[in-house]
Every structure is written in C-alpha cells, then in structure tokens.
Amino acid sequence: MLYALDPNGETTTATMNGGYITNNKAKEGAGVYIYAGNPQFGDSKSKADFTFNGGSITNNVASESGGGIYVTWNGNVVMNNGIIKNNTAGIAGGGVATYDQFVGVVGGQKVPYSRVGAPWNNWPNIYRAGFTMNGGSIDGNKATSNGTNKLGDKGVGAGIYIASA
C-alpha cells in the first residue's frame, strides 16, 4: 500500500513509476491513499496529487471508497500508463476515487464545508477533484452497494468515481 499524507494541509504528492500494489485491504484507498491533511478553508495550496506512470494496482479491497486509488482534498489523479484491475470498493470508485471534499462531518452531522468557512461559489475554484487518463488500462473493477458515502452515493464508479462541486 502507498500512503501519503501532509499533516500541515499543504500539497501531498506521490508518483508511481513501476512495481505492484496488490491484495491490500482498507476502509479507503486500499492500494493508494493520498490525503492533503487538515487544510485551512480557502487555502488553495491544499491539494493531493497522484501521478501513475507505470506498474499495476490490482486485487485491492476498500470497504468504502477507492479500492485501487483514493485521493482527497483537491484530489487529482493523472494516469499516463499502468494497470488498475480487479479492485473493489464497498461504496464508490472500485478502481479510482477522487474527491474535492465539499461535504464533511461537523458535530456528527453531514454538512457542506461552505457552512464552516469556504463559500460554495468559490469552492470549485479552490478545491477540485479530477482524473486525467493519457494511457494504461482500467479493467474489471467493482463498486458494490454495501453502504452510502457522505454524498449519499452507493455502488457507483466501478472504474472511476469523481466527486467535485
């Protein structure tokens, strides 16, 4: 498993040029988990980037999102080559899940982060979720319906799931 986190809420970046990530289990991001930490709202420096240039991410199982790859807080994935195959997510993004984090949990309640400091109309300009595929293959991934994510989705994005405002 590849795990990258910046606890200061700055840019978290990881690149995979080859090798194998296989047969892992986790709640989110069973193969690859990239998270920008705890950013301050409105801080455009806060982002999580993963570049996949080669290798394989296979047979990983996430009970919630991102069986193969999970990237969150202004999450961006660029796939130039490689294989994402036979990964499973219990809710969303069997192969890849990337989030902008517009919805969060505050005081045990699911609310848009706009209620706690980042206005909705600026959100897409500050935090974006994206996926670019220039090559490689995404095949045989699954998203089941074992629950719902914070957006109310379930069983979506078997190959790729992008949640952006």
Regions found by a protein language model. Give the residues of each.
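Surface-exposed loop/turn motifs in large extracellular/passenger domains
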Residues: 1-25, 33-61, 69-88, 96-165
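The feature encodes a structural signal of leucine-rich repeats
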Residues: 30, 66-67, 93-94
